[in-house]
Amino acid sequence: MGKTIQVFGFPNGVSAEEVKKFLERLTGSGTVYAIKVRQPKKGGPRVYAIVQFTSERHTRLIITAAAERLYYGRSYLKAFEVEQDIVPKPRASLHTISGLKMFFGCQVSTKKFLTLWSAQDVCVSFGIGMRKLHFSFSWYQKDYRLELSYENIWQIDLHSPQGRSSKFLVIQVIGAPKIFEKEDQPINLLFGIMDFYSDGSDEQWIRTTDFTSSSCIGQSTAFCLELPVHLNVPDFRENFANYAEHRASSFLIESGSSYSSNANTLVPVVDPPPGFSLPFEILFKLNTLVQNACLSGPALDLDFYRLLNQKKYDRALIDHCLEKLFHLGECCYEPAHWLRDEYKKWISKGKLPLSPTISLDDGLVYMYRVQVTPARVYFSGPEVNVSNRVLRHYSKYINNFLRVSFVDEDLEKVRSMDLSPRSSTQRRTKLYDRIYSVLRDGIVIGDKKFEFLAFSSSQLRENSAWMFAPIDRITAAHIRAWMGDFDHIRNVAKYAARLGQSFSSSRETLNVRSDEIEVIPDVEIISLGTRYVFSDGIGKISAEFARKVARKCGLTEFSPSAFQIRYGGYKGVVAVDPNSSKKLSLRKSMSKFESENTKLDVLAWSKYQPCYMNRQLITLLSTLGVTDSVFEKKQREVVDRLDAILTHPLEAHEALGLMAPGENTNILKALILCGYKPDAEPFLSMMLQNFRASKLLELRTKTRIFISGGRSMMGCLDETRTLEYGQVVVQYSDPMRPGRRFIITGPVVVAKNPCLHPGDVRVLQAVNVPALNHMVDCVVFPQKGLRPHPNECSGSDLDGDIYFVCWDQELVPPRTSEPMDYTPEPTQILDHDVTIEEVEEYFANYIVNDSLGIIANAHTAFADKEPLKAFSDPCIELAKKFSTAVDFPKTGVAAVIPQHLYVKEYPDFMEKPDKPTYESKNVIGKLFREVKERAPPLISIKSFTLDVASKSYDKDMEVDGFEEYVDEAFYQKANYDFKLGNLMDYYGIKTEAEILSGGIMRMSKSFTKRRDAESIGRAVRALRKETLSLFNASEEEENESAKASAWYHVTYHSSYWGLYNEGLNRDHFLSFAWCVYDKLVRIKKTNLGRRQRQETLERLDHVLRFG
C-alpha cells in the first residue's frame, strides 16, 4: 500500500485545511503531507480529497476507519488507495535534535573555533531529500529559523575530546543560511484553500536579515553544535564527502570578536591593520579569499600583511600566489607560512610566474563585481566584460566602477515574495530594506566609497546595478550628466531605462558628425484609435559606411545587412540602404534623449544564427494544430544526428557547422578534414561528446529542438514600400558554403520569444523582391497594413529584436489566431524632475514586482493541463499579465497575479519532484520522456588519462628539432593551464570541453549561461589569442613547425601527463596545443601525405619485385 488515498464524500465547499484537521484527529498531528480537494467531473454536492500521508501506516488507518463507517459531520466518507503520490519525492525530515547550544564563528585551526555569537535551546532538523539543515531557536522573544542548504556546506567535522561531557559538530560553510522570523499572527493560507502542501513556504515564516549585533551570522564561516557525548549522530557521509570524525582529539572553543570593517554595514569585509596600505586590487582579492572561506578572517595577522608588500615582493608573484590560494579548495589556516613557502618555490626556480590575468583585446575590460545577499557580501573578479560607452570614456578610472548584484544566500535570484510576502502584498520585509539601503548608502572597500550610478535593462532583470567611487572630482552624478539630458523624462521607469542605455555592452566603431546624419520621418498610422509605428526603432545606413563599420567590428568575410546600434541618444537598428547618401538616417522613434556623443557603438549585427524551437513555441504551434508526431519526428532527427557525430566524420562536420558556428568549431572541422576520427583523437572526441551532451540536456530541460529549415533573424523594415501586409522577405546565408544565399518563397512561421498568446505566431508569405536582395540573414517586414507584424509578435518592434523564422512546411500550423492587443498601460507622470533616490527605490520595487518567470512557468503548466491549451482562459489571462510584466521596466505598472492563477500541480517535464506532479499527456511530456533517459542531468566525458596519453600520441606531429623548444613550451603550457583552470574554477565549470565550447552543463550559481556565456567565451578567446601571441613572439618563421610540434608534445606525450597545475587537483588539459591548430594541421597533412607516398612506393616496389 502507498502513502496516498482518495477520500470521497466531503460536502461542497470544504477546504484543504478542514480536511487536514479532520484526518489528523485520527492519524496524529503532522501526518498529512499534501492534500488536493477536487470536484467530481459530473459535479454534485460532494467533493473528494486526494491525501498524501507521511507514512503508509496512516493510509491503512483511514481506509480501515472508512470501511467501518467514517463520517464528516453528516457526510459518509469512502476511501480508496491511489497509485501515484501528489509529491513523488517528498522532502521528509527524519532527524530532529532539540535543546542544543549553537556557536557562530570561525575555525582558526583544525582544533580551534572562535565564537562570535551563540544561541541556546536550538532545535536542528534534517532528512532525506531536504538537502538542507534547519536550525530553530528564540532570541529576545522572537522565533527564528535558519535554513542552510547542503550546497553551502563544504566540510563537517565531529570532534569528541577525551574526558569531556560534550562533543562538537562543526559545520564549515561557504555561504550563509537563509534567515526567517515567525509572524506574530498565524496565517492559514498555504497553497490556496483547496490545496495543502506541508513543505510549501509556510506563510508564518517571513524572510529577514541578520538580527545579531555586528551581523555575526553573516561573519561566521562555521557553526558549531555542542552535543551530549552519548547522543548518536547520524552518518553524514551519504551527503557529505568531506565528513570526518576526530576521536580523543583536543578541541577548543574560545571567545572572539568581530573582524569585519567598521566602515561597512556589509559583512564580512576586511581592512588592512593601521599602518598598512594595500592596492585596491590586492585588498579586493583578499576579501574574496575571506568571503569564500579560503582564508579565516581572524587568522590574518601582521606577518601575513607584510608578505603582501609589493615594494618587497614582485607584484606578479603576489597576484599569482593569492590566485592559487583561491583555487586550493580548502581553508588555509596559516596563510603567512603558506605564502613564504610559495615565494621560496618560485624564487628557487629562477623564473617568476607570469601575471595570472589574461591580456584582453580592445573592447574588453576587467570588471570587479560584488554580490549582496540578505546576510553576507561576496567580492568576485576581476572578470571579463564587454565594454560600454561609459566605461570607454572613463577608462582611466576603470577600477572605480563596480557591478553590484542582489542575490539570495544560494546565489540565485531573490524571489519577489521574500521582499513582499503573499500574506500582505503591501508589506515590505527587511530584505527589501537591505537592498534599498545598499543602493542609497553605497559600499565601502578600502579608501573607496562606491555610490549608485545606473543600470541597463538587462541588469535590471538580473537585479544588478553599476556603482562608482568618486575620484578627481568625478562623481556618479557627473557621469550621468555627461551621458545626456534626461530632465524632460518625468516617468521613473522610463528615466531609469534611458540612463541604462549607455551601459549596453557594445563596441565602439567610427565617429559620425552631425552633418553626416539625417533625421527621417517615422512610418505610422492610427488604426482603431491606436497609434502604430511601423518603423519603430529602425533607420538606415549607407552601404559604403556599413562596410567600414563591419571592418571596424573585425568582420572581414562579409558585411552585415543590419546593425543594432547606439548613437548619442538614439538606439535601435540601422539597415543597409544602397540608395542612401548619408552615413546614417535615423528616426524620431529611435531618439530617447539628447546627447552630444558622436561615436557609433555597435551591439550586434545580422548574421547566420541557428533556429531552435522551445517549449513556448511548441505549445503555441500545438495549440494551433501542428500534430504531436511532427514534433516527435523533429526531435528524433536531432537525436539521431547527435548520436552520429561521435563516429561519423561527415555528420560531425555538418552538425558543427549548422548548430555551433564559431572559432572553436573551425578548429574541430579542421581536425576532421585532416583525417582525425571523432572517436579516436582525444581532444576532438572530448569536444564532440560535450557538444552532444549539452544539446541533449537542452532537449530534456528546455525542449530546445534544432530546426534546419529555419533561422533566428534580426527584424528589418521594407524601405522600398514594395511588400504588402502579410508578406515578408527572407534570404539566408549557408554556413557550410560561404557566399551562397537562398531566397525563401511561400508560407513562413514568424514569432518572437517569449511568446505566450496563440496570436503571437504569425503565418506570413515570403516573397522575392529584387530591390531587397541586399538584405541577408534578416526578416524584412512591410510598412503597409492596419498593424505592424512585429507588434503582432508579442508586442515587439524593430530595435534589435531577434525573430524565429521557419519555412519547414510541417511546422506551419493549419490555423492562426488574432494577435493580442499589446497597447501598454498608461504611465505615471510625475509633477517634478525624477530624483536618483526615486530610481533607487524603483530598482527595489522592480524586484518586488518581478513576476515574469512565475507567469511564464504558470502558463507552461496551465497550457499542458487545460484541454484548450494556450487558448484556455487561464493562459489568455496569463498572456495579458505577462505583457504587463514585460512593460514594467518602461511603465512602472506591475502585473498582479490572482490566486486562481497559482500553479497547484506541475507536469513531469518541469522536473519539480518536491512539488505536486502529474504525468503530462501532451506533446512536451511525450518529448521529455522520449529523451529523458538519453540525457541525464550530468553526462560524464572521458578524462585524458595516462593510459589514453600512451595510446593516442600521434608520431605524425613530430618535426625534426622540436626537442629544442620543449622547455619553453612546457613553461607556456603551465601558464596557459593555470589560467584556464582558474577560469573554470571561477565560473564553476567542471570540464575543459564545456568552457571551450560554451556547451556548459552546470556552472556556479553566481552565473547564468544566458547572461555570462558571452563573457566566458570572450575570456577563453582572449586567453587563446594571448597564448598565440607568445608563440608568434619570436621571429624564427622557419622553425615554427618545430615549435608547434613541441607544443603538441608537451600536451599529449605521456611523460608530461600530470605535471601541470601542481597541487590543484585538476584534469590534464589538451587545448593548449590547438591554439596553433593551423600549424599542427599543416604538419599532420604533410607527414600523413609523406607516409602515404612512402607506403605507396613500398607497395609498388613489392609488386615489381615479387609480382
Swiss-Prot record:
UniProt-listed InterPro entries: RBD_domain_sf, RNA-dep_RNA_pol_euk-typ
GO molecular function, one term: RNA binding
Keyword Nucleotidyltransferase: yes
Disruption phenotype: Upon viral infection, increased levels of TMV-cg, tobacco rattle virus (TRV) and CMV genomic viral RNAs. Reduced levels of TMV-cg-derived small RNAs and CMV-derived siRNAs.
This enzyme's EC code(s): 2.7.7.48
Induction: By salicylic acid (SA) and infection by a crucifer-infecting tobamovirus (TMV-cg).
Gene Ontology BP, a term: wax biosynthetic process
Recorded catalytic activity of this chain's protein: RNA(n) + a ribonucleoside 5'-triphosphate = RNA(n+1) + diphosphate
UniProt keywords, alphabetically: Nucleotidyltransferase, Plant defense, RNA-binding, RNA-directed RNA polymerase, RNA-mediated gene silencing, Transferase
Entry keyword Hydrolase: no
Family (UniProt): Belongs to the RdRP family.
Function in brief: RNA-dependent direct polymerase involved in antiviral silencing. Required for the production of some small RNAs (mainly 21 and some 22 nucleotides) derived from the crucifer-infecting tobamovirus (TMV-cg). Required for turnip mosaic virus (TuMV) silencing and accumulation of viral siRNAs. Involved in cucumber mosaic virus (CMV) silencing. Required for the biogenesis of viral secondary siRNAs, process that follows the production of primary siRNAs derived from viral RNA replication.
Protein name: RNA-dependent RNA polymerase 1
Species annotation: Arabidopsis thaliana
